[in-house]
Amino acid sequence: SNSKMLSSEIASTLGGRFMRVDIYPYSFPEYLAAQGKDKNYLEVLSTKDRAEVVGMCDQYVKYGAFPELVDIRNKREYLNSIYQTIYLGDIMTRNKITNDFAVRLILKKIAESVAKPLSFNRLSNVLKSAGAVLGKQTVINYVGYMMDSYLLFTLQNYAAKLVEKETSPKY
């Protein structure tokens, strides 16, 4: 967890005497390599190999591709512990958020809208209709906290106009 210090706090504390290295989940080819499959593995596949790759793809989609997950038997429990640490430590406690219901709704709505444009106004309206009234700025702040703790990432919107890029971010 990064609940002790987020990267912006590390920079100010260490005064520039550090190098930030972000470690992201595996791409699917990297995931296959971590499973012991040669990089040319996908080029020459028998029927048995195809079935194995489909099974690996299912696991990749279901559990994600954190490098340490390759060797962990109970993946769901491990992922849940990461989520709880980030959610409770890095988001709720660090930012003194007491509206747990609203934060969970924001996460659920973003999760069900993956790769689709989603405005902060829309999120605020969804919360209001569910009984959790939050202003647009509070929603923006909460999503920012989620991004600071690496729970969410934005997907680059390749719209030609700046306004289109910035008004409907994708996560």
Q: How would you describe each model-predicted region?
A:
Residues 1-2, 39, 46-48, 131-132, ...:
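A short linear-motif detector with a strong N-terminal bias
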Residues 2, 27, 158:
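A generic "binding-loop/recognition-motif" signal
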Residues 1-3, 16, 165-171:
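Proteins with a high burden of low-complexity, intrinsically disordered sequence enriched in S/T/G/P/A and R
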Residues 7-117:
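Interdomain motor-coupling "hinge/lid" segment immediately C-terminal to the ATP-binding subdomain
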Residues 71-171:
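Accessory nucleic acid-recognition modules appended to NTPase machines
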Residues 1-10, 146:
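Sensor-1/coupling segment of RecA-like P-loop NTPase cores
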